[in-house]
Amino acid sequence: MPYSLEEQTYFMQEALKEAEKSLQKAEIPIGCVIVKDGEIIGRGHNAREESNQAIMHAEMMAINEANAHEGNWRLLDTTLFVTIEPCVMCSGAIGLARIPHVIYGASNQKFGGADSLYQILTDERLNHRVQVERGLLAADCANIMQTFFRQGRERKKIAKHLIKEQSDPFD
């Protein structure tokens, strides 16, 4: 189902809310929602650190929730909104779930599986191809990632300072 720009913006803002949940837990802030007939049927945010599971990406969580909602592994007639371009693993899962449409915010130059590094979602050698749109609220989506990495650098500085204070009592 095609959505208007206003509707797409709303759903990406919902994905950004999911990304914010990850940011609050010091996780890489990626958020995702899956929409069918104008209703969000799956939500997810990155939770690898919290769960100690490498596959707990936003897209994987949203796919699992949408599968449960639909009672089916096939997520036909859905659109996946994600703040950052899906990685290779998530791109594979999107194809396997038969999600026909993906809209993402910012590119993923290091791990992108939709456009930047690999084109898994549109590869003609695969039996399921996905319509991909990019750049929706890209600045907002990139901004939350920059905030995460800036906070990480600040946490490292504080930790380094605390370690120095503890190890050198004569400072």
From Swiss-Prot:
Question: Which stretch is the leader sequence?
Answer: none
Q: Which reaction does it catalyse?
A: adenosine(34) in tRNA + H2O + H(+) = inosine(34) in tRNA + NH4(+)
Q: Which UniProt keywords apply?
A: Hydrolase, Metal-binding, tRNA processing, Zinc
Tree of life domain: Bacteria
Catalytic residue list: E59
Q: Which cofactor does it need?
A: Zn(2+)
Q: Name one GO biological process term.
A: tRNA wobble adenosine to inosine editing
PROSITE patterns annotated for this entry? CYT_DCMP_DEAMINASES_1, CYT_DCMP_DEAMINASES_2
Protein residues bound to Zn(2+): H57, C87, C90
| NCBIfam families for the chain | PRK10860.1 (NF008113)
Entries under PANTHER family matching the protein? CYTOSINE DEAMINASE FAMILY MEMBER, TRNA-SPECIFIC ADENOSINE DEAMINASE
Q: Which function does this protein serve?
A: Catalyzes the deamination of adenosine to inosine at the wobble position 34 of tRNA(Arg2).
In its UniProt entry, what is this protein called?
tRNA-specific adenosine deaminase
Protein source organism: Streptococcus pyogenes serotype M6 (strain ATCC BAA-946 / MGAS10394)
